[in-house]
Amino acid sequence: MRNDNPLLILLIAGLLPFLGKAQKCGTRTLDPEIAGFLRIIGYQDLSLEQLRAMPIGQLKFPQIPLLPYPKEDVQRIKVTRDSIPVLVFNPLHKDNLPVIIHYHGGGFISPLVPGLEYSLWQDARNYEAVVFAVDYRVAPEHRFPAAVDDSYASFQWIAENAQRFGGDVNKIVLMGNSAGANLVAAITQRAKKAGIGNRIKLQVLNGLPADLRPQHMESSESYLQNASGYFQTKALCYFAVETYAPEQYNDPEVSPILAADFSGLPPALIVTAEFDPMRDDGPLYAAKLSAAGVKVREKCFAGQLHCLIGALPESKAQHEFVTLVKNAMSDHLSK
C-alpha cells in the first residue's frame, strides 16, 4: 500500500544519508592480517575489575618495539613555562615545511613512550612536514584538565615558534590518535574562543572518542558490537574515563560532542575503524561539524581495529590512511 504521508517521506529522506553511512563500513569480517596479529600477540580481554587491580605502570607503558631511526632527525625540547616535553621531527632538514602537531593516544594514561617515536619520524617523512609530538601530562597523577591544558599551551607555543625548527606557522595541522584526537577536538574549541582558531588549517581525528559519557557507552551500537575481543574494549574505555575524568564526562572538553557551537572550527578528516567501540563517535561528531558548515571528510576502515592497530606500515590500510592525510593537507594548506 502506498504511503503519501509527507512527514514520513521527509523523515525517511533525512535518515537515508545516515543509514547509508552505517552500511558502508565492512561486513563484520576481520581483516585476515589483523586476525593474525591478535593471534600472534596472544590477545586476551581484561575485565574492568582486572584493569582496576593491575599496577598502573603496566598500563602506562605498553610494550611497543623500538625501531631505529636517525637520531639527528629529532630534537627534544621543553616548551612554555611549565616545561612540557615535545619531540620535534624534521628528517628532511628543510625550512618552510607544514607543521603537524601530534597528540598521542593511550587512554589519557600513557605518556609519549619511546616505541611511538619511529612512527612519528615516519609521519614527518610521509607528509614532508615538521612533526611536533607533545608529551602532555597523564592520569592518574594528573587528571582532567591537565592534558587539555598542556595540549593547548603547546599548540600556542608551537604556533608562534615552529619556524625555528623548519616549520611554516601558516600551515598548521593538528593530528590526534584516540585520546589525542579527543584533545585535538578540545584544542580547536579553545582556539576558536580565543580568536586564534584560524591558525589551524586542518584537524585529523583518528579513532576519536567524542562522547565519554557512560550512557553513551551503554547505548552506542559500536560499543555493543565491539565491547570485547578487538584489542580496544569497552572496559578499557570505562577505565580510561574513571582514571582521567571520573566526574567530568559531561564537560565538553571531555566529551567534545557536547559543545554548544561547532561553527568556525577547522576542516576535519575523521577516520574510524569497523571493529572499534568508538566507531560511531566519528560519524556523530562529523554530523555536528557538517551541520555547522565545517568541511569534513570521513573514512571508516573495514575489517580494522581502533586507530588501525596491528596494520603494518606496508599494508593497504596504512597506505590509504597516508594518502587520505596527504590529500587533506593538499586541499587545505594551499589556501
Predicted regions located by residue number:
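Bacterial Sec-dependent N-terminal signal peptides
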Residues: 1-27
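Alpha/beta-hydrolase superfamily serine-hydrolase fold, recognizing
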Residues: 25-335
